[in-house]
Amino acid sequence: FNEYYSDSKKAIEIEETDGEQTLVIPNLRPDAAMQFLSRRAYSGSNKSSLYRFFETREKYYFCTSEYLTDKYSGFEGISNEERNRLFFNYRVLDDNTGTGQLKAQQSINDVRYGKKADSFAEMKGGAYRRNVTELDILNRTRISRQYDYTSEYKDYKAPEDLKLTHSQEFIDSYMPSALAPSTTLITDFPQIGQNKGDLDKPYQHFYENYTTKPAVDYHMNLNAFTIEINGRIALYPGMVINLDLYKFSNTVAGTRETDTQRSGKYLVMNIDHRFTGDEYKQSVLITKGGLS
């Protein structure tokens, strides 16, 4: 970062990584090189290790979503004015009163849900379970391990406690470990607790990065959706907002009942700004990795 972003006046906020790695970076653009490092980075405290490199108006970030959730999801001690800035209410009819227009600045204009779960793709891609065999060419050892998202996901920090998209019974019946995708990794480093040997090379976390990152990333993207708001609110990727959504069936009927599964804290993933004449809209991609 210091070499290729030396002309930038923006600071970078970095979440510390764990472990030592020796990497040869291919001939990549600076941003692609940072993404390359994010794919190899490992965190012992934030179990997903799903590092991202991204830029906002204020600075650059190199961190996990768990780091952002820990640092920016607390609303305790924040004034009502600041707190309300992060709350959004779905509205059907415009309220043209003075108070109504103030509320409109924090109201959702549209909700666009993303793709539905594809169970066949999840079976094939190992969205819940994966089998990994590590072949240690130096020590001539073979280690087989099974990754199970259903037993690990509660250890991954999200804006709120999550539920699995499928029931445990469905996953056990149609995505058993015995039928999970299998991959073989060639390693040249000792396992945890083994002697480093003559190369003095520490454990490289191949297994953790190969299994955990794709699974967590899949569920975060699967459960992401887009909200549209008037462009008057200071939002940026990495912010945690508190979202109020109502059940659409009740809203159309003229009543409002909170959708408890989809309301709550969300992590802002991306923002698109659109200007049409004198209208300024923001399309905000948000996720919390699952339902509450």
Task: Describe every region a protein language model picked out.
Residues K9-I14, P214-A215:
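Short amphipathic alpha-helical segments, especially helix-boundary/capping motifs
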Residues I12-R112, K116-F120, A127:
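Short beta-strand-centered interaction patches in the first periplasmic/extracellular domains
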Residues F1-A11:
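Glycine-rich, acidic and aromatic/proline-enriched surface loops and short helix-turn segments
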Residues N80, N84-S292:
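An acidic/polar, Gly/Ser/Thr-rich interaction patch typically located in mid-to-C-terminal regions
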Residues F1, Y60-F62, I227, L243:
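Generic low-polarity alpha-helical segments
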